[in-house]
């Protein structure tokens, strides 16, 4: 299917990215919405809403409507999406043409329908084309979907990790894990609390993750600020790379195991493509220091992070929106 006008949406657990045909990326903001508790009025969406999280007034509630890559709160997701599209100044006529929406490869039919429903609330009578995230990631990494060559994609998002072999515009083999960057942050928060008696906020945990990553050689460390679990007072602490690596080990191991299991089931005619094409890491989790090296060491196949991994899926969705060549269609929902 080829779309010459419309909108491409990567509605992620952590961030939402919106591209318009002919204009490119116009929205890249946190998937968050702030609502007035008493009236339900939208107070803020995106960055402004996310900035209120943990600091919001008593009469304001901050929601993150997606969980594990799919919609957990349909009303909040619809309102958030409406705010983004209004800010993008999307003309109503354009969306009557087409919308390309990225979904986790492991999303159920019900979860896919909820995404279509969220969009239909915002703009009725549109054609929603669901595209599996690994396919969009392959397009965003520069691979021609019209060609039959296979590419191995590991897309580590905020709520899910997708391991997939993509060839000819469709998924040949895939596994979806309901863990990603958010689970890594939570693991760091939990480990630091247990090991150091320090309560960390989400942003502090994320900084430890992206700075120290899997540096478990004992040489790396980072200063962070949290709340002493016993005294309930602010405290400065030096956190080692070894402790962060320990916190992340079970998640990284699950990702590596999934990659290895996928490789053991790869069709022989695609094996050469994968080895020569390398394992391509996309998504925010791809920026975890040491993850690509860990996958390469476990598999013996070069693993590299794609250019601008945070926007790779959105870039591919925009490419499919404007060109669509070679895409094997997923469910199409007419509204």
Model-predicted segments: where are they?
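Nucleotide/phosphate-binding catalytic cleft detector across ATP-hydrolyzing
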Residues: 1-154, 166-280, 286-335
